[in-house]
Regions:
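Domain-wide signal for the mature, well-folded portions of proteins, strongly enriched
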Residues: 91-97
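PAPS-dependent sulfotransferase catalytic domain
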Residues: 47, 51-60, 97-204
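PAPS-dependent sulfotransferase catalytic core
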Residues: 1-89, 204-206, 210-217
Length: 217
């Protein structure tokens, strides 16, 4: 069965940033289905693909194709087929779009891996034309919340995560857009620019209604 022509949107953020509320707002848009977190599950698929790709180029293909070689057959790793099949796997098991879904994706708070840039570049290979929505929040409020407040001070860790995802957003150009929780909670109209970036009409009444409902419960 041919894969559907879907657009993809990924929310890039950190824990306790209000991203569940943002997910709720995005899902008010007709045809949008943005899933919640998956504990960075796709990163394991990235590591599989990148490992196989690197090992398939570990030496001359003539030697790697010899049945006496320890890595016999690895040179035949079909990189493009791997990308297609990973896209199908993620679509069928993680995203699970509805019949009327036009844009799908997920929000994730675990973007702190050291290979962040390489991982996102790979996501763009798996999901061509994917876009990335970066969500931030006032650090003082984040650090007071839940596990951020437990144990030793985590302010430097939070600052480093935000610095990296903002640098990522800048490197992605028009494929990325930034929103700030404190701005759109204070005034939902602050999200108008996000809707314009998405190419979708801004329904202020629906956004306000959604934001009046408690999320992340």
């Amino acid at each position: 069965m041919p894969q559907r022509d879907l657009n993809h949107l990924f929310v890039v953020t950190y824990g306790r940033s209000g991203s569940t509320l943002l997910m709720g707002v995005l899902n008010t848009i007709p045809g949008f289905l943005i899933r919640g977190e998956n504990r960075d599950a796709l990163h394991h698929l990235y590591r599989f693909h990148s490992t196989m790709l690197a090992e398939s180029n570990r030496g001359p293909k003539r030697k790697l194709n010899q049945p006496t070689h320890p890595f016999f057959g690895i040179a035949g790793f079909p990189a493009q087929k791997s990308l297609r099949q990973i896209r199908r796997l993620a679509t069928d098991t993680v995203l699970r779009p509805d019949e009327d879904t036009r844009v799908t994706g997920f929000k994730e708070i675990r973007w702190y891996q050291q290979d962040l840039e390489e991982y996102v570049a790979w996501l763009q290979q798996v999901f061509p034309s994917a876009r990335f929505l970066v969500n931030t929040r006032n650090h003082e409020d984040v650090l007071k919340s839940k596990w951020w407040a437990e144990g030793e001070d985590k302010s430097e860790h939070l600052a480093d995560i935000e610095r990296r995802i903002l640098t990522l957003a800048e490197s992605l150009g028009d494929a990325a857009y930034r929103v700030h929780y404190d701005d759109y909670v204070a005034d939902p109209v602050a999200l108008r620019g996000m809707f314009e970036w998405l190419g979708e009409p801004f329904d202020e009444a629906t956004v306000r209604e959604t934001m009046a409902v408690r999320h992340s419960i």
